[in-house]
């Protein structure tokens, strides 16, 4: 007897950006992973789970969705932040985490907020540590802009992909968000 296992294909692409290499992973409908690294294994490690219990096959090279994602990232670095903010993504999480990620996607480029402000804006006052953990497990960097979250004392804080990348993204957004 031959067993046929349903397999889904995930495509992956790495591009050069002003903030360094950026790798994305997605199927035909949404992104599952994205981060400032050329190391696909690192992006894969950031993904907590994939939907469904089917097999996944990783294929290098962009499909139509990743071509659109590449365009969205290029537009981001040209100062058009909307395509990244509204791009289709998926990541597993609790209702709390999904609310925090949704709040982050609604923040404006150039806006910075503390972890406690993020928790408050998400409807969970006092859940500062949980909001910080939610940022730490974000598997779709840039598309969920955790880089906009700073410490209450105004310092930059940590960033899973590289602290200098966080600084560069904050400065990029501050500079371009002020444009007329």
How should these model regions be labeled?
Residues 129-141:
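Regulatory, non-catalytic segments
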């Amino acid at each position: 007897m031959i067993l046929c296992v349903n397999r889904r294909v995930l495509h992956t692409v790495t591009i050069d950006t002003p903030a360094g290499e950026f790798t994305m992973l997605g199927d035909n409908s949404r992104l599952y992973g994205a981060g400032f690294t050329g190391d696909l294994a690192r992006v894969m490690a950031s993904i907590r789970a994939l939907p469904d219990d089917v097999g996944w096959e990783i294929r290098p090279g962009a499909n139509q969705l990743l071509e659109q994602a590449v365009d969205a990232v290029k537009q981001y670095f040209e100062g058009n932040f909307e395509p990244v903010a509204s791009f289709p993504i998926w990541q597993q999480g609790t209702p709390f985490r999904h609310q925090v990620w949704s709040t982050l996607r609604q923040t404006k480029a150039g806006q910075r907020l503390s972890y406690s402000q993020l928790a408050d804006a998400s409807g969970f006052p006092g859940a500062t540590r949980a909001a910080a953990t939610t940022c730490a497990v974000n598997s779709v960097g840039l598309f969920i802009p955790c880089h906009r979250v700073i410490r209450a004392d105004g310092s930059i804080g940590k960033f899973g992909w590289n602290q200098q990348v966080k600084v560069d993204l904050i400065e990029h957004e501050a500079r371009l968000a002020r444009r007329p």
